[in-house]
Amino acid sequence: MKREITEKVRYVMDELVPPAIRDSRWFMWPFFVMAYGTFAVRPFMEFKSRAYAMTAEDYRNFYASLGNSISRRRISDLNEASVRFITEQLRHTSGTSLLDVGTGNGYLLSRLSGERAWRRLAGVDVVAVTGESTHFEFHEGMLPSLPFADHEFDVVTCTHVVEHLLDVEASIKELLRITRRQLFIVLPRQRYYFYTLDEHLNFYPHIEPLLRLLQPHQVRHELRGGDWAIAITPAMQTAAP
């Protein structure tokens, strides 16, 4: 199901259904059953209460266990408006190396591969890439500790990942550490509910809490199709002659 459609479904559920009903276990149970393809949805419904006690290995194993869930069946969480934001900003950014953090099946790398003659295309995720995407180098790793050197990539993308992170502040610092010229972050504008699909832990109905973590870097952000699309130029780059 395309992101543009799921955003409409999310809007109806999160904005139009009364909160007391929307965040009740009995109301959300059938949606979890449909999303995860099983009646044994307790681990997924209780993910928020368990996540912060997880070790890195627990976290990896949880995501590896998602199997054929609705989030794994989607080609991408990105909407077209957010992809356009990235491609528009890339026209003003130099560099020939690109890393996609949380790359999944490599969808965004495929979309961006034709934007210029990249010298290096790479992706990193907590679980190995599935499917036939072999046009880029793949690394296993997870935020906030990625297996890359300081400023190793000219461009870094991190789309629909921040909402899943256990430590957002440390992860933002790590993304900036490995970025030389431009960092792109995309995440949903979504209000908090305990029972939410897609394993979300962090919610940004307003962008300001995240922007505070991006100081003193140069930031441009727009709301694109229900998602926050953010372009960050590291302070070291803006200060360069």
Identify the meaning behind each predicted range.
Residues M1-A149, T159, I172, T196-P241:
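Conserved N-terminal segment of class I S-adenosyl-L-methionine
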Residues T96, D154, R181:
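Conserved acidic residues
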Residues W118-R119, T179-R181:
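A short helix->loop->beta-strand "cap" motif at the edges of active sites that frequently abuts
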Residues T157-L166:
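A short SAM/SAH-binding and catalytic strip from SAM-dependent methyltransferases
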Residues L165-E174:
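A short, conserved alpha-helix within the catalytic core of class I
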Residues L166, T179-R180, Q215:
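Short conserved AdoMet
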Residues R181-R189:
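Conserved beta-strand signature within the Rossmann-like core of class I S-adenosyl-L-methionine
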Residues Y192-F194:
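Short, solvent-exposed loop/turn segments at secondary-structure junctions
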